[in-house]
Amino acid sequence: MKTLCSFLQISRNMHQENQTTITEFILLGLSNQAEHQNLLFVLFLSMYVVTVVGNGLIIVAISLDIYLHTPMYLFLAYLSFADISSISNSVPKMLVNIQTNSQSISYESCITQMYFSIVFVVTDNLLLGTMAFDHFVAICHPLNYTTFMRARFGTLLTVISWFLSNIIALTHTLLLIQLLFCDHNTLPHFFCDLAPLLKLSCSDTMINELVLFIVGLSVIIFPFVLIFFSYVCIIRAVLGVSSTQGKWKAFSTCGSHLTIALLFYGTTVGVYFFPSSTHPEDTDKIGAVLFTVVTPMMNPFIYSLRNKDMKGALRKLINRKISSL
């Protein structure tokens, strides 16, 4: 984190030498009303704790249960880690600002927060596509699943997802630090996100917006198409199964993933790809809350309540902790 901040400061000095620029941003948060701050603090602290504990339990349960050491559940563990990281990137700073009655964040910290925000959103997106492909192989080609989806191959897909997300985040960051922000430093948001930062700049942002659209659309379309065609094949395969129990198991496994995917894509596309002029800024905030806070919080509930194997693993983990007391 410190290395990235130092790099940003050096790069900024090189690109903006002899030009007057701001040194901090003001995050307006979700509400300007003083009477709402305590409610927001309690609400988001509760959601943060639930998200960290819930996703943490999924990671621990999968790690300790040898029967869940398959790519399907390892992808879920990686998704849970990305969700914990995503909400930890934005909510703690917001809670600190509420408690200290301070809305400021330094330029370097803001750009760093934006960088990791992009990393975790893109990683979530790519992992959802990877999980859909894994479900497709498991249900449509069950005899070849253990041969094709080996642990090493699953790890490789995860590493590729993290690598691509960092490359994309670095591209946006390097383009952003070349922009000037002049005297405008007020962000109508609760964290430093790319879209509102571009609106705030007094430089020409055409290249930034073009890259955001092209790269963002590519990152969205490929996993979405993979998810769509995977589930078309899965539904056709499941409908051909004569066993009612087999159909229910397949739909319960895939239904959890599909629910998370629809919630994630719906809010992400709404925030980043629809023109801001067509809806108020509050809509962007609500969308950002949904995919950075609500979706990570819902992840453990949706997967644990609809998946028999996860419920069993969590039950064993809880019983083990109780018996050790």
From Swiss-Prot:
Main location: membrane
Protein species of origin: Homo sapiens
Keyword terms of this UniProt record: Cell membrane, Disulfide bond, G-protein coupled receptor, Glycoprotein, Membrane, Olfaction, Receptor, Sensory transduction, Transducer, Transmembrane, Transmembrane helix
Name of the protein in question: Olfactory receptor 1S2
Gene Ontology BP, a term: signal transduction
Source taxonomy: Eukaryota, Metazoa, Chordata, Craniata, Vertebrata
Family: Belongs to the G-protein coupled receptor 1 family.
GO CC annotation: plasma membrane
Topology in the lipid bilayer: Multi-pass membrane protein
Protein's UniProt keywords contain DNA-binding: no
